C-alpha cells in the first residue's frame, strides 16, 4: 500500500546519483511541489546530488516552473530529453558545459520506458537515421562534456537501424489528479494521459521507487477501475499537493475542462487568428490537407493550422492528433500545446508514437528554424543573430518527419523580419536579423536525403514563397503576391535553389481577411 507523505519527505527519499524519470508535457504531468522540495533540500543540505534526469518531452512553462526548478549546479549532472528548451536554468548549465546532455527523439524515450519495464536491452528503430542522433553525426550529444554513447548503429537483415540502450530507473516522479488510500491514481483533471504508467513500471521493475503527486485524496474502493491510470500496487509514495499552483494542467491554465474532456467547448469560444504572416503560412499549410486525413501539428505556426481548419468549418472533416495522445478536436497552441479542445479520445503517449512511427498519419505540419539546399531542417540547436544560441532538442520532430509520407514545414523566411499585408499582397518592411535558409544547417534534425530516398513528399511554406523537395533539391514552386523573386527571396538565401518551370503565385486569398481556400479541397 502506498504511503502518504509530504513533498519535503519525498525529496529526502531520492538517493544521490540516482536516475529519475518523469512523464508528461509542459506542466501536464509535472509534480511541481515535489520538484520545489528537491531543489530546496539541495540548497539546504547538498542532497540529492549528481542526479540523471530522463524525460520524454518539454517539461516546464518557459519561465520558472517545471524542470528548470532543478537547474542548480551539482543537483543534476546528466540530462536526457527530447526537448530541453523550456527549462532555462537547466539549459544554461548545458550551454556552460556544466551538465552532460543527450537529446533523443520523443517517441524513442517514451517507448524506451516499456523496454526497461520488460527488461529488454533497448529499442531498435530506424528513427534518427541520418539526423544528429545518428552516432555517425553527433549521437544526440548536445555539448562537449557529453561523452557517453547512448545510441549504436547496428545492421539487422541487411538494413541499418539505431539501437537505443535501456538503463536502470531508480525513481519515477509523476503526477495525477486523485489518489485513493491504496495509492490508485486517476487523471480526471489532466488533459493528456501521458506515459506515467510506463515510467512507473520501469521504476518498479528496476527495483526503484514511484512517487506520485496528486491534488486530491479519496477513500479506498471509491475510484472506478477504468479511471485508474496507475495502479496503487505500483505506487510507493503519494504527495497530496498543498498549493494549487503546483497542479497546473498546462503552462497556460490551472484547469480547462475542455482539455480534460469534462466539457465540450463551443467552437465560437475558440479565438480566431488575426490576419498576419503567421495566418498566411498556416492557411497555406492547411491547403495540403485532404478530407478524412489523420494529421499531426507541431508547435508554433503549425499549431495554428487547427484554428484555420476550425474557422473554415471543416474541423469535423480532419482528425488532428497530438504527440502526447490526443485524437480529434482542436489541438491547442502555446502555452497549452499538447492538450486539445474537445478531443474525441486520449491514448497514452507511447501508443501514439507507435502510430506515428508506423506511418499511420497522412500529413504532418511542423516548424522550420533553419533549412539548407539539401532540404535538411534544423529545429534542435541553432543560432539567431543578435539573440544567441538556442538549444531545444527535437521533441517528436524526428519520429514524425521520418515516418509520415507527406510533411509540410512552416516558418518565417528570415528570423525576426517585419512584414505587412495590404491589398492582398505581402510587403517586406524590414529584413530579419538572420537568414534561415543556409548553405548547411547547424544541426540535422530532418534529413532531406533520407526523405528523398524514401519517396516522401516534402514542402516548405514561408510567408514569401513555397519550396518543394524535388530530386533532392530545394525548389521554389510558389511566390507570394508583392514579392520580388530576386530581391526578396534569392538575395536573402545562402544558396541558390532550383526554380520550378511552372512557378506560380500563391493564392491571393491567403493574404485577405476572408478566405475560402479550403472549400474546394474539402469538397464543398
Swiss-Prot record:
Q: Which GO terms describe its biological process?
A: ketone body catabolic process
Q: What does this protein do?
A: Involved in caffeate respiration, which consists in the reduction of the C-C double bond of caffeate. CarA catalyzes an energy-saving CoA loop for caffeate activation in the steady state of caffeate respiration. It catalyzes the formation of caffeyl-CoA from caffeate with hydrocaffeyl-CoA as the CoA donor via a ping-pong mechanism. In addition to caffeate, the enzyme can utilize 4-coumarate or ferulate as CoA acceptor. Neither acetyl-CoA nor butyryl-CoA served as the CoA donor.
| EC code(s) of this entry | 2.8.3.23
Which named protein is this? Caffeate CoA-transferase
What is this protein's gene name? carA
Q: Which family does it belong to?
A: Belongs to the 3-oxoacid CoA-transferase family.
Catalytic reaction annotation: hydrocaffeoyl-CoA + (E)-caffeate = 3-(3,4-dihydroxyphenyl)propanoate + (E)-caffeoyl-CoA
Please describe the quaternary structure of this protein: Homodimer.
> InterPro entries this protein is in?
3-oxoacid_CoA-transferase, CoA_trans_fam_I, NagB/RpiA_transferase-like
Q: Does the keyword Chloroplast apply?
A: no
Thermal properties: Optimum temperature is 40 degrees Celsius.
Active-site residues per Swiss-Prot or TrEMBL entry: 323
A Pfam family hit: CoA_trans
PANTHER family for the chain? ACETATE COA-TRANSFERASE YDIF
Amino acid at each position: 500500500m502506498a504511503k502518504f507523505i509530504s513533498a519535503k519527505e519525498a525529496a529526502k527519499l531520492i538517493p544521490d546519483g540516482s536516475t529519475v524519470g518523469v512523464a508528461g508535457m509542459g506542466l501536464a504531468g509535472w509534480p511541481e511541489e515535489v520538484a520545489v522540495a528537491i531543489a530546496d533540500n539541495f540548497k539546504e543540505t547538498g542532497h540529492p546530488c549528481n542526479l540523471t534526469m530522463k524525460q520524454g518531452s518539454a517539461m516546464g512553462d518557459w519561465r520558472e516552473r517545471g524542470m528548470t526548478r532543478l537547474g542548480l549546479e551539482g543537483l543534476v549532472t546528466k540530462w536526457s530529453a527530447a526537448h530541453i528548451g523550456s527549462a532555462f536554468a537547466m539549459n544554461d548549465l548545458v550551454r556552460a558545459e556544466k551538465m552532460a546532455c543527450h537529446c533523443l527523439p520523443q517517441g524513442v524515450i517514451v517507448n524506451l520506458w516499456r523496454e526497461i519495464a520488460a527488461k529488454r536491452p533497448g529499442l531498435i528503430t530506424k528513427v534518427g537515421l541520418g539526423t544528429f542522433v545518428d552516432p555517425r553525426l553527433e549521437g544526440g550529444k548536445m555539448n562537449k562534456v557529453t561523452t557517453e554513447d547512448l545510441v549504436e548503429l547496428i545492421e539487422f537483415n541487411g538494413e541499418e537501424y539505431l539501437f537505443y540502450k535501456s538503463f536502470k530507473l531508480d525513481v519515477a516522479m509523476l503526477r495525477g489528479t486523485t489518489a485513493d488510500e491504496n495509492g490508485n491514481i486517476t487523471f480526471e483533471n489532466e488533459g493528456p494521459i501521458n506515459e506515467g504508467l510506463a515510467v512507473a513500471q520501469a521504476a518498479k521493475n528496476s527495483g526503484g521507487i514511484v512517487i506520485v503527486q496528486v491534488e486530491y485524496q479519496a477513500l479506498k474502493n471509491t475510484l472506478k477501475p477504468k479511471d485508474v491510470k496507475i495502479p496503487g500496487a505500483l505506487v510507493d509514495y503519494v504527495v497530496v499537493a498543498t498549493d494549487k499552483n503546483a497542479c497546473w494542467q498546462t503552462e497556460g491554465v490551472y484547469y480547462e475542462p475542455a482539455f480534460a474532456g469534462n466539457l465540450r467547448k463551443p467552437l465560437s469560444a475558440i479565438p480566431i487568428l488575426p490576419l498576419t504572416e503567421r495566418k498566411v503560412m498556416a492557411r497555406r499549410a492547411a491547403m495540403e490537407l485532404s478530407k478524412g486525413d489523420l494529421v499531426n501539428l507541431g508547435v508554433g505556426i503549425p499549431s495554428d493550422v487547427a484554428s484555420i481548419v476550425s474557422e473554415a468549418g471543416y474541423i469535423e472533416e480532419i482528425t488532428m492528433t497530438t504527440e502526447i495522445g490526443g485524437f480529434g478536436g482542436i489541438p491547442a497552441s502555446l502555452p497549452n500545446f499538447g492538450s486539445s479542445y474537445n478531443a474525441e479520445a486520449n491514448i497514452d503517449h507511447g501508443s501514439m508514437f507507435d502510430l506515428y512511427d508506423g506511418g499511420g498519419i497522412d500529413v504532418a505540419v511542423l516548424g522550420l528554424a533553419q533549412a539548407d539546399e539539401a532540404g535538411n531542417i534544423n529545429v534542435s540547436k541553432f543560432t539567431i543573430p543578435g539573440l544567441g544560441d538556442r538549444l531545444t532538442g527535437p521533441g517528436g520532430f524526428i519520429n514524425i518527419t521520418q515516418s509520415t509520407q507527406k510533411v509540410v514545414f512552416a516558418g518565417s523566411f528570415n528570423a525576426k523580419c517585419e512584414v505587412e499585408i495590404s491589398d492582398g499582397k505581402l510587403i517586406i518592411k524590414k529584413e530579419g536579423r538572420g537568414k534561415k535558409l543556409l548553405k548547411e544547417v547547424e544541426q540535422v534534425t530532418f534529413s532531406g536525403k533520407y526523405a528523398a530516398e524514401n519517396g516522401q513528399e516534402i514542402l516548405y511554406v514561408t510567408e514569401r514563397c513555397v519550396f518543394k523537395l524535388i530530386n533532392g533539391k530545394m525548389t521554389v514552386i510558389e511566390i507570394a503576391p508583392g514579392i520580388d523573386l530576386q530581391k526578396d527571396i534569392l538575395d536573402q538565401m545562402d544558396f541558390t535553389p532550383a526554380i520550378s518551370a511552372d512557378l506560380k503565385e500563391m493564392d491571393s486569398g491567403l493574404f485577405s481577411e476572408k478566405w475560402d481556400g479550403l472549400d474546394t479541397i474539402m469538397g464543398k
